[in-house]
């Protein structure tokens, strides 16, 4: 019965089942599962990168944190910190496939420019759209540099490099 109602609901909207909704929900559930099961508490150096500006998690940050703090202790969840603390220590987000300046600014408020990486989402998005959007961003230049390169250098422990003249 559930399958039939699912088919009826999504039959004319099958394009929503993939990247726009289903992928984000699945990744969000896995990431939050890692948090609530104490994975980052047991492995504090573990770093996870979530694409698409955090797969909706930053937009539910207050609600998730509210439930973690008010409900987690009675449920006996393994996590020891708040969702915001895990984002500050273990979770990163990318701009991949999400070239919206207001959305980026919101994510900067929620997780901080120090935890965001510029990314494109190729082959689903093209370099031209991503780079045109990024080059035209009207945000603090220091934050733009962090998102564009400094955060990746830090996360991936990249050595110093020589800027090409091209």
Roles of regions detected by a PLM:
Residues 51, 119-120:
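Active-site flanking residues adjacent to catalytic metal/cofactor-binding acidic residues
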Residues 26-33, 48, 95-101:
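Active-site glycine- and acidic-residue-rich loops that bind
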Residues 1-2:
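Short, small-residue-biased leader/transition segments that mark boundaries at the very start
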Residues 35-38, 42-86:
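Aromatic-lined glycan-binding groove of carbohydrate-active enzymes
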Residues 7-14, 54-69, 104-109, 125-137:
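Histidine/acidic-residue-rich catalytic or RNA/ligand-binding cores of hydrolases
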Residues 37-38, 46, 79-80, 92-94, ...:
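Mid-to-C-terminal alpha-helical segments outside catalytic/metal-binding sites
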Residues 5-25, 67-90:
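Active-site gating loops and adjacent loop-to-helix segments of metal-dependent hydrolytic enzymes
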Residues 20-40:
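Specific transmembrane alpha-helix
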